[in-house]
Amino acid sequence: MPPKGQELDDHYFGTIRQRVASYMKDVNEELWKLGVAAKTQHNEVAPAQHELAPIYAEANIAVDHNQIIMKTLKKVACEHGLKCLLHEKPFAGVNGSGKHNNWSITTDDGINMLDPGKTPHENVQFLLVLACILKAVDVHADLLRESAADPGNDHRPVSYTHLTLPTN
């Protein structure tokens, strides 16, 4: 394989196959019934890999949504005669499933504490909050490592939430 080996633009920029589109439609309908809305779905880089991104929610709700999504993906895949692989690295050298949550910090009035200002004066708040986050990561690095250390994370770089389906 070349250095990255996954420059499969024909898949990434291609249209979603009809069988997969039908599956994704049914997944969306099931998720709506459960109160989970997805805003993005498209092909991903690896063969037969697709992304589904839920709409932003509070952290505890977003984590629950991710669990519901994974269960729904597998259930609906079976109904369509498909197999949904959610492993971080199902095959050597090929992207796998990256399940993660993004986070932000806002005040009660809706001010985004991680929004860089447009002027040096407005940027002070962002720099202070960022410095505090970096200090916390430094002080609690052992706890962060323990919370993320598992065999799956040993074999994957940072990635995004993916759905992997067969190509046929």
Positions of PLM-derived features:
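Catalytic or ion-translocation cores adjacent to nucleophile or general acid/base/metal-coordination motifs
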Residues: 15, 32, 65-86, 93-95, ...
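A glycine-rich phosphate-binding loop feature that marks nucleotide/adenosyl-phosphate handling sites
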Residues: 43-50, 89-97, 146-160
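Structural beta-strand/beta-sheet cores of well-ordered domains, especially the beta-sheet scaffolds
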Residues: 34-36, 48-52, 80-82, 97-101
